[in-house]
């Protein structure tokens, strides 16, 4: 893990507090996160899992491997856990309401954060930073950082041992 035990515990509390957790395709393929709540004191939480898949047609093996995940795609597919978002006017809020998702935690990746920050779609943004140097992997793009600076304001900073959590809210 990049983050420490305190950051991981807070992440699982955040996961337990929402109805759904979403990631992008690359995060699924590279990190293969479980997207569950792993905290012995919070056992009844089971957020709905969503992957913004996009246009990549190589989805079949992932659909069967992750039958507990809804895949949002830009194409139709026969699987029950694939939801096509083809219409430009597709209403994500309506979809989330139909899935009983009133609160959604976006955990990554960079493309999703880029879209959501640029369009000021986050109510709150939690940024966990580690002092550990990471030489590979996906970093936030400059666009995400610029959107955070221009469209969000930091409301709290917490030092968590060798990690820092900064929370932002939309301006």
Describe the role of every protein-language-model region:
Residues 1-171:
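Enzymes that bind and transform nitrogen-containing heteroaromatic metabolites
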